[in-house]
Amino acid sequence: MRKRHAKKRHGGVNWLFIVCLLVVIGGSGYLIKTFFFTRDSQVSQESKVVLEEDRRSDNYANLTKEIVAPDSGELDQKIQETNYIGSALIIKDDQVLVNKGYGFANFEKQQANTPNTRFQIGSIQKSFTTTLILKAIEEGKLTLDTKLATFYPQIQGAEDITISDMLNMTSGLKLSAMPNNIVTDEEIIQFVKQNTIQVNKGKYNYSPVNFVLLAGMLEKMYQRTYQELFNNLYHKTAGLKNFGFYETLLEQPNNSTSYKWTEDNSYNQVLSIPAASFAHEFGTGNVDMTTGDLYWYLHQLTSGHLVSTALLQKLWTSSQQSSYHGGIY
């Protein structure tokens, strides 16, 4: 279980959301994300300027097509000049300025990145798991003060660890060993129950095991798999359409191949990630999606369409010991 992070900042008066998903490196989708809310590249690609007036970011269709706004050619050019490889979505004042792919998703097949290329989102998935937990809180299944012992009493210190502690990474939980040859959710939960210890409770310590346990709690509460819960909320309710779990990524025509970064962006070192490595990331980092779907999720979340903004604010102000709250800094 690797450490992969997202960051939360507040300020400004308009939406400004920038998502840049790099070609997957070492099994981690690296995401650079900045959002404010109070309300080749080696592929020769001509910018397709969308002249239509409807570039609103609250229209999901606009997140699936290539867009370079008439006044955003310089932004597009700057991205190309960096030899950036991946997909970029830039939104300002609820208008899509740039939504475009750069470089190759698969160099051997000469398959270019597009707005519909899917990338591993890494630890951003922790925010999705958090929202599922908050949804359960709204449904009265638990609270931020519910103790870990309610679900996993055998874990060291469980009687003093709250859901809030786990979401804020202040539980003190960590693995005493790393799993090998584990490929199912049940196996990783069993391993975690047997190999989790507690150190320095109350202090921030980034440990993905918190979210493995939270995913396990969700399955216990609903008697449904984590993937079923994920699909029900984010596909059926939120309307995400271009995402999936690691088991099906390679089957998708719009998936991205992993490459090791090189100075010349030569695409000459393909990285093969064992399925077991992703299986270990249960609830913490084994989902792939497009930049558009990631934006759509965050837009729905911060607009109060998934859980109440009051509950979000309660979580985000629940700890003075940590700047990390439920998958976002």
Regions found by a protein language model. Name each.
Residues 160-208, 212-329:
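Short, surface-exposed loop or secondary-structure junction motifs
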Residues 1-13:
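N-terminal Lys/Arg-rich, disordered targeting/topogenic segments
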Residues 78-110, 327-329:
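A short, well-structured edge-of-sheet supersecondary motif
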Residues 35-55:
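Ser/Thr/Pro/Gly-rich low-complexity linker/stalk segments immediately outside membranes or between
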Residues 107-206:
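Active-site-proximal loop and beta-strand segments within enzyme catalytic domains
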Residues 17-30:
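Hydrophobic membrane-insertion alpha-helices, especially the h-region
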Residues 88, 94, 129, 133, ...:
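Residue-level preference for non-acidic, small/hydrophobic
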Residues 68-79:
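Short, basic/aromatic recognition patches
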